[in-house]
Every structure is written in structure tokens, then in C-alpha cells.
């Protein structure tokens, strides 16, 4: 298939890896963070790290939307389903994220709550139209990639006067999170690692373009290379980052030229701006409160805002103390550093959100066997 098979060529991957090994200076460390969960998945699936020299390290960043969703947000959705008799609709991975008291949306569904998995925001609106006597709430999560469809469906609900439909908005923003990682004293208190450059997200960049990343390269001296999802995309991006570091450059480069432009999808951006505005602050799992890092629904669409309609009050909830998901999201620890990984915590029984989504670092490591260094204990 065009644009797929040719980006999975093993021989070409070996040649790119040879260039990385040749150009990475032996006495220097290269710490690169891939922000996108799709990149984390590709790196584990195709064994990219095994092709890199020891002094080139890939750090898994907070780019999985399910992983960064805090417990308190899931609790709000559970409250609507269990106590307000609402039909709650959301994407599949969100159903399994652990919430307070060991509950999750899928467990609440087993207890009788009307919680439904949907493939799109449009599915949730159709459910609201089929059940006009019930309140239907769409739990909307994701980065800039999934925000335009939510904006479109809110606008459509207003036009069609579907008054029993609302959205619990948990959409978050990539540039704000990267800024927070680079400069926040709170994150420094949590602990973090030195970052020499970023592999920029693919789908997000299709929407927002490369322009927003120019701030990081200019203000923080950090190179950014936007990369596609295939293994050769990631390998080439790593090589481009090594070359930037070696030459003392900090620029935004676009490896994913077949899909990403400097200005992105301006029609999608305009639609998002019409329906949403910035929140002053939003809690991220692993990062804490991040200023201006999420969206809320504008006043002219307030009747479709579940937080206002149901007078919801967000309450932060601490993570499971034994789960290292927060530290893994910051790159401080690897999945194999967590004592729950591949023992109590598996994709079938996730203790933390990093094991829920296939884009999560723990799930990717588990699914593709990247944990062979865990010592086996004899029975």
C-alpha cells in the first residue's frame, strides 16, 4: 500500500540506523522526547530503540490522551451515569481508565449504568436524537486531532436543536504541555529529565501545522522534528535531531512533508476557535495543573456544556501510589521501573492509564515484549 510499505522497509531502516550510529558522538548523550502516543506505539512495535546506539535515548512523553486524563475527570462522567441517569458516550479506551475506588466506566456499565462506546462524536449525537427523553453526554477527550469533530457536533446540535445533548469537554493542547515540561517549577519538583529535542506529533501537526513549535526552538533552544507514524519516519526524525544537536542548531524541521504544512488545517482551526476557548488551567496526570492547556465550551454554546448543565465541580484525586504512570509520562521512569508492570498491571487488568491505551508507554512495552530485562522469579 502506497505510503505504508515503503516506510516499513527493514533494509532502509538499517541504513538510517547506521547513519545515526555513525553521527552520534560517543562522548555525548542525546535525550529525545517523542510526544505522540502513536510514535510511542511505533517505537515499541518496530523495535526502533534496538536500532539506536546506547547514547541515543527515546523518552516517552505525555502524548497519549487517555494516559494524561486525570482520575477526577473520569469521576465526573461516572457521577453523570450513576447519579444523574445520563447516557454517557465515549471512545473505547476511555472506558477502561481506572477511576476512584477501583471503578471505571466499563465496570459502571456492568453495574447497570448506561455507558456506551462510540467511534465518533457524531455517534453520540445520533444516540441523543434517538432518545429525546434522556440526557446524553459525550465525554470528549483528545488533543487537537479530535477537537474539530467535537466542535462540529456541538455546532450541529445547536443547529438541529438537540437539547438533550451535551459535552463533557476534556480536550487538551500539545504546545502548552511541551512548554510546561520545559519551564514549569512544578514539573521540576516532580522530577524530569534533560531533553535535547522533540519528535513532534503527526496527526496533531496536520491540524495545527509546524508554526506553533517555532516558539520552543526559538525560546528554549530545542530542536523539533515533526514525524509521521511509520518506523522509517521516526528513524529519519531521530537522525535529523542528532544532526541538529551536533551542529548546534535548534530549528523546526518537517519530516512528515506528505501531510503536514506550516499553517495546518486552517478551516479546522477556525471551527475550534468558534466553539471553544482556553481554560485558565487544567489538571494533567503526571504534570499537575497546566495553565492554558485545555479547552472549554464558549458561552454561546453553554447549553451543550455538561459542566454547566449539571453544575459539575471538579475534584482532583491522587493516583494509585504504587503506579508510576505519572513519572513514566514525564520520562523520569520507564515502564519496567514500575513494580506493578506485567505483574498486577496488564492490559487486561490496568492499574494505571498508561496500560489502558495501545498508545500508552506501558501497554506498548507489554504488547510488543519490550520488557525482557525483567528478572523472572522462580516459583
Swiss-Prot record:
<dbReference type="InterPro" id="IPR002780">
    <property type="entry name" value="Hyd_form_HypD"/>
</dbReference>
<dbReference type="InterPro" id="IPR042244">
    <property type="entry name" value="HypD_2_sf"/>
</dbReference>
<keyword id="KW-0614">Plasmid</keyword>
<dbReference type="GO" id="GO:0070025">
    <property type="term" value="F:carbon monoxide binding"/>
</dbReference>
<dbReference type="GO" id="GO:0005506">
    <property type="term" value="F:iron ion binding"/>
</dbReference>
<dbReference type="GO" id="GO:0051539">
    <property type="term" value="F:4 iron, 4 sulfur cluster binding"/>
</dbReference>
<protein>
    <recommendedName>
        <fullName>Hydrogenase maturation factor HypD</fullName>
    </recommendedName>
</protein>
<keyword id="KW-0479">Metal-binding</keyword>
<keyword id="KW-0004">4Fe-4S</keyword>
<keyword id="KW-0408">Iron</keyword>
<comment type="pathway">
    <text>Protein modification; [NiFe] hydrogenase maturation.</text>
</comment>
<feature type="binding site">
    <location>
        <position position="67"/>
    </location>
    <ligand>
        <name>Fe cation</name>
    </ligand>
</feature>
<dbReference type="Pfam" id="PF01924">
    <property type="entry name" value="HypD"/>
</dbReference>
<feature type="binding site">
    <location>
        <position position="64"/>
    </location>
    <ligand>
        <name>Fe cation</name>
    </ligand>
</feature>
<feature type="binding site">
    <location>
        <position position="36"/>
    </location>
    <ligand>
        <name>Fe cation</name>
    </ligand>
</feature>
<comment type="similarity">
    <text>Belongs to the HypD family.</text>
</comment>
<dbReference type="InterPro" id="IPR042243">
    <property type="entry name" value="HypD_1"/>
</dbReference>
<comment type="function">
    <text>Involved in the maturation of [NiFe] hydrogenases. Involved in the biosynthesis of the Fe(CN)(2)CO cofactor.</text>
</comment>
<keyword id="KW-0411">Iron-sulfur</keyword>
<dbReference type="GO" id="GO:0051604">
    <property type="term" value="P:protein maturation"/>
</dbReference>
Amino acid at each position: 500500500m502506497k505510503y505504508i510499505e515503503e516506510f516499513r522497509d527493514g533494509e532502509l531502516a538499517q541504513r538510517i540506523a547506521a547513519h545515526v550510529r555513525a553521527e552520534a558522538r560517543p562522548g555525548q548523550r542525546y535525550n529525545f522526547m517523542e510526544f505522540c502516543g502513536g510514535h510511542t506505539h511505533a517505537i515499541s512495535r518496530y523495535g526502533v530503540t534496538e536500532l539506536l546506539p546506547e547514547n541515543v535515548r527515546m523518552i516517552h512523553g505525555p502524548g497519549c490522551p487517555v494516559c494524561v486524563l486525570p482520575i477526577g475527570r473520569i469521576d465526573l462522567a461516572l457521577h453523570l451515569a450513576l447519579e444523574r441517569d445520563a447516557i454517557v458516550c465515549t471512545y473505547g479506551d476511555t472506558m477502561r481508565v481506572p477511576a476512584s475506588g477501583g471503578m471505571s466506566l466499563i465496570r459502571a456499565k456492568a453495574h447497570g449504568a448506561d455507558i456506551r462506546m462510540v467511534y465518533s462524536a457524531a455517534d453520540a449525537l445520533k444516540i441523543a436524537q434517538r432518545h429525546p427523553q434522556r440526557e446524553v453526554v459525550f465525554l470528549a477527550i483528545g488533543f487537537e486531532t479530535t477537537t474539530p469533530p467535537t466542535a462540529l457536533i456541538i455546532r450541529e446540535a445547536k443547529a438541529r436543536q438537540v437539547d438533550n445533548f451535551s459535552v463533557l469537554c476534556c480536550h487538551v493542547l500539545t504546545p502548552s504541555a511541551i512548554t510546561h515540561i520545559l519551564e514549569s517549577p512544578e514539573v521540576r519538583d516532580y522530577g524530569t529529565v534533560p531533553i535535547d529535542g522533540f519528535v513532534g506529533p503527526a496527526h496533531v501537526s496536520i491540524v495545527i501545522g509546524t508554526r506553533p513549535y517555532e516558539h520552543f526552538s526559538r525560546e528554549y533552544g530545542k530542536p523539533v522534528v515533526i514525524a509521521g507514524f511509520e518506523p522509517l519516519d521516526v528513524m529519519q526524525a531521530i537522525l535529523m535531531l542528532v544532526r541538529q544537536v551536533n551542529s548546534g542548531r535548534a530549528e523546526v524541521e518537517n519530516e512528515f512533508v506528505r501531510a503536514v504544512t506550516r499553517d495546518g488545517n486552517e478551516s479546522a482551526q477556525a471551527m475550534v476557535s468558534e466553539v471553544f476557548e482556553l481554560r485558565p488551567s487544567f489538571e494533567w496526570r503526571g504534570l499537575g495543573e497546566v495553565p492554558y492547556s485545555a479547552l472549554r465550551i464558549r458561552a454561546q454554546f453553554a447549553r451543550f456544556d455538561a459542566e454547566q448543565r449539571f453544575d459539575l465541580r471538579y475534584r482532583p484525586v491522587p493516583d494509585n501510589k504504587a503506579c508510576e504512570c505519572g513519572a513514566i509520562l514525564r520520562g523520569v521512569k520507564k515502564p519496567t521501573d514500575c513494580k506493578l508492570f506485567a505483574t498486577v498491571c496488564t492490559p487486561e487488568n490496568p492499574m494505571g492509564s498508561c496500560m489502558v491505551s495501545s498508545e500508552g508507554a506501558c501497554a506498548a512495552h507489554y504488547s510488543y515484549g519490550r520488557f525482557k530485562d525483567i528478572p523472572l522469579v522462580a516459583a
